């Protein structure tokens, strides 16, 4: 064999060895990346929601929305996103603001590349805030548009809540209720400072003044909260159309009892809205409920491939009742709630 042929053979062997090594490294990186995305546990949840015009208003400025990804990578890295928004502003501006907020947040949240849930939520909220603010500046009829926004990301066995305004998130656990969020309102600040009692705040003519919202300023800083979930927990997101008529003790009686939990989130959401309307229904009313059915810890990375086989039953209640079960593989599941 000539020196030239020997050199070519050596180069070929070296290239083959390098390719094998490269392929092995790439494979190892892919496996490591897959395992890094693997959730430590998987939470089965039942969802029910209802939005209602109320007994007085002509337009429904409330919106709820959520997205439960069917793609394993999105589910593992971003979790499931749920939200309630209560728009404000004349000439249908409130409807537009709440709709823009929910759609923009969901799209931006899942598009963001950050590995931190809070960072992605902050980015998504900033995108929604900027869009609504810019729209309000360009169109005179929408000058005062804005919206509250209360979001919950279900990630593994935790709920990460991002919040602006006076819509609320509650935790119902073992017959007790805890308000997760703190209202961004003038009366809430006065109560916090001791200047008003709760009873005075409820009767104050300034009780509807919001001190922080989406779209009314160039920038907004949401508050963040973390809830460690237990099996049997019930999470409730709602607009102030509910809490303006129902006290926490009313909510826990109607939504936190064993019979209410057994009835399911959809029936409970309808009951809460019904009672709020019976007590006057002065505002639009929106309720979204998450029932934490099971928290299953994953032992092996391979088990993640089977997540989509697990049932994720979904039930929406709008002006007419509709029911949707788990979607086909390869499609994200979302539902947008509105009454127009």
Name each model-derived stretch.
Residues 1-340:
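PP2C/PPM-type serine/threonine phosphatase catalytic domain
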């Amino acid at each position: 064999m000539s020196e030239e042929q020997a050199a070519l053979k050596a180069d070929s062997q070296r290239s083959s060895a390098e390719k094998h090594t490269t392929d092995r490294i790439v494979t190892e990186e892919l496996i490591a990346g897959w395992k890094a995305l693997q959730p430590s546990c998987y939470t089965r949840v039942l969802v029910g929601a209802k939005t209602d015009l109320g007994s007085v208003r002509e337009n429904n400025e409330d919106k709820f929305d959520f997205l439960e990804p069917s793609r394993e990578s999105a589910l593992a890295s971003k979790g499931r996103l749920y939200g309630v928004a209560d728009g404000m502003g004349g000439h249908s501006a409130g409807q537009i603001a709440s709709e823009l907020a929910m759609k923009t947040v969901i799209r931006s949240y899942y598009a963001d590349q950050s590995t931190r849930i809070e960072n992605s939520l902050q980015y998504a909220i900033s995108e929604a805030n900027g869009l609504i603010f810019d729209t309000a500046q360009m169109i005179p009829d929408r000058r005062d548009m804005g919206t509250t926004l209360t979001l919950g990301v279900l990630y593994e066995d935790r709920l990460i809540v991002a919040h602006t305004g006076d819509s609320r998130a509650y935790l119902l656990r073992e017959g007790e209720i805890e308000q997760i969020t703190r209202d961004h309102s003038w009366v809430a600040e006065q109560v916090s400072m001791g200047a008003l009692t709760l009873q005075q705040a409820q009767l104050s003519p300034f009780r509807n003044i919001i001190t922080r919202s989406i779209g009314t300023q160039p920038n907004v800083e949401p508050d963040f909260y973390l809830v460690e979930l237990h099996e049997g927990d019930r999470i409730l997101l709602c607009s102030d159309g509910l809490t303006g008529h129902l006290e926490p003790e009313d909510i826990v009686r109607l939504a936190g009892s064993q019979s209410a939990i057994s009835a399911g989130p959809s029936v409970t959401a309808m009951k809460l809205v019904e009672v709020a309307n019976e007590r006057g229904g002065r505002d639009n009313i929106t309720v979204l409920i998450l029932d934490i059915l099971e928290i299953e810890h994953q032992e092996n990375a391979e088990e993640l491939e089977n997540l989509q086989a697990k049932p994720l039953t979904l039930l929406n209640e709008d002006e007419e009742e509709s029911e949707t079960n788990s979607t086909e593989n390869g499609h994200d599941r979302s539902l947008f709630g509105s009454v127009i």
